[in-house]
Amino acid sequence: MLDMKKIRQNVEVVQKKLKTRGVDEEVLLRFLALDEGRRALLVKVEELKKHRNQVSGEIAQLKRAQKDASQQLLNMQEVSEQIKVLDQEVVHLQEQCTAIAERLPNLPHESVPVGADEAANVEVRRWSTPKTFSFEPKPHWEIGEALGILDFERGAKVSGSRFLYYKGLGARLERAVYNFMLDQHVNEHGYTEVIPPYLVNSKAMFGTGQFPKFKEDVFQVAESDLTLIPTAEVPLTNYYNNEILDAQELPIYFTALSPSFRSEAGSAGRDTRGLIRLHQFHKVEMVKFSDAEHSYEELEKMTNNAGDILEKLGLPYRVITLSTGDMGFSAAKTYDLEVWIPAQKTYREISSCSNCEDFQARRALIRYRDKTGHVQYAHTLNGSGLAVGRTVAAILENYQNEDGTVTIPEVLRPYMGGLTKID
């Protein structure tokens, strides 16, 4: 949620920034008109209440003097009715203001490139050079099916499209990957591991910005207030929902492995094969709580934490800064890490690391008491560290051999009983 005071004080700046995020100027003008009307009514209500209190005092005096107070009583009744009507109007205007405010995206940081879509994204850096194969590299789904470690056909039979079974060494590889990621984040990067709920209420989904705007992207439990999490960002960020932290506790680092459930609404025809776009997948998530002063420093660290995993796995990747039109709803700035996928001859997203500043904290009421004793909204950050299925896909493709086998990255071998190859 945006800071309403900031909007009122910087209308033109906010309007300009929201426009870069695809928000029509009229939307903000409509909000401001409603808000101005609401505030004007509040002033009027306060004046009427003040008048009612004054009349109430007069009535008390008249009654003590045993004088007629009928006129004053009538006047107070009329004022009370006016207040009741105006209070209802205030509530109605507040509901309209809230409906608009809840759907306004976060304002982009000044360093974010301006653009309508991914074409305006800016590459920051690359790590390693993609391997040159002496043969035509196969896509990961062909490799996995040939080795008998991925079964998309039976996944579709049981659950429909975009589901699969990991089998044998495929399941073991998936497990090795996420255990390696968790160990790195806990032992090397300083995160506290959490096992969160996989079902959350609508309040939690609102807090991180999925609700109300993106309800069609998730799986909701029928006749319930619960939703299957689209990412562990939701339960991890809401851990401190409606709480006040102490500044000395910050920054706080959480990491969690969880399944993620997404309807992939609007993705028809995209990545219909393989592990890139599924309805259910594992992801290791990183979440941070920071003060305002250090949140962008923490974003750089988080991005490096994700990159460290890829580097230790020996997977070539690049980092890009997302443009204003390509960022997620709650983000003020986002870095995407994209891993090299040989069969597609391109880089594909494997992690998004975002600083949401105080946007989510305002929605979820996550605050901290600073050194002066004042209560401030915390800054929240989140990032994939990493998407596990996409990491498995990248390993299968980058480490494939001409004979159809796959070499296991050295750092994963201790997690796979010393195996060096999948054959």
UniProtKB/Swiss-Prot annotation:
Primary location: cytoplasm
E.C. number: 6.1.1.11
Superkingdom of source: Bacteria
GO CC terms, sorted: cytoplasm
Cross-referenced SUPFAM superfamilies: Class II aaRS and biotin synthetases, tRNA-binding arm
Catalytic activity: tRNA(Ser) + L-serine + ATP = L-seryl-tRNA(Ser) + AMP + diphosphate + H(+); tRNA(Sec) + L-serine + ATP = L-seryl-tRNA(Sec) + AMP + diphosphate + H(+)
Keyword annotations from UniProtKB, A to Z: Aminoacyl-tRNA synthetase, ATP-binding, Cytoplasm, Ligase, Nucleotide-binding, Protein biosynthesis
Localization of this protein: Cytoplasm
Molecular function GO terms recorded: ATP binding; catalytic activity, acting on a protein; serine-tRNA ligase activity; transferase activity
Gene Ontology BP term (one): seryl-tRNA aminoacylation
Class in the EC hierarchy, top level: ligase
UniProt domain comment: Consists of two distinct domains, a catalytic core and a N-terminal extension that is involved in tRNA binding.
The protein's name in its UniProt record: Serine--tRNA ligase 1
Organism: Enterococcus faecalis (strain ATCC 700802 / V583)
